[in-house]
UniProtKB/Swiss-Prot annotation:
Keywords: Activator, Chromatin regulator, Cytoplasm, mRNA transport, Nucleus, Protein transport, Transcription, Transcription regulation, Translocation, Transport. It comes from the Eukaryota. One of its GO terms (cellular component) is SAGA complex. The keyword Cell membrane does not apply. This is Enhancer of yellow 2 transcription factor. Gene3D superfamilies: 1.10.246.140. Belongs to the ENY2 family. GO terms for molecular function: C2H2 zinc finger domain binding; chromatin insulator sequence binding; TFIID-class transcription factor complex binding; transcription coactivator activity. InterPro entries: TF_ENY2, TF_EnY2_sf. It is found in: Nucleus, Nucleoplasm; Cytoplasm. The lineage of its organism: Eukaryota, Metazoa, Ecdysozoa, Arthropoda, Hexapoda.
Amino acid sequence: MSVSAAVDQYTVLTGDRSKIKDLLCSRLTECGWRDEVRLMCRNILLEKGTNNSFTVEQLITEVTPKARTLVPDAIKKELLMKIRTILTENEEEADEPEDES
């Protein structure tokens, strides 16, 4: 299992994944990224025409690489720090001895 997959599985199991996802969504909205991607999708659809031959999957394939490059580095760093904090906190909790009451 890759480190990325292990972190993903761990955050799902601890319930932290939804917190990280909520943080990401709010930050992307705050910086205007969502509006930018929405406009990019609209422009691609206008460019391709309205003949219904362009599928959602094709749109996603075309937009995803461009959209990823538009995510500000500050947001990427913030999320990475949040994930590290979560992993560190949970590792420290796992290292603490059990209370034998």
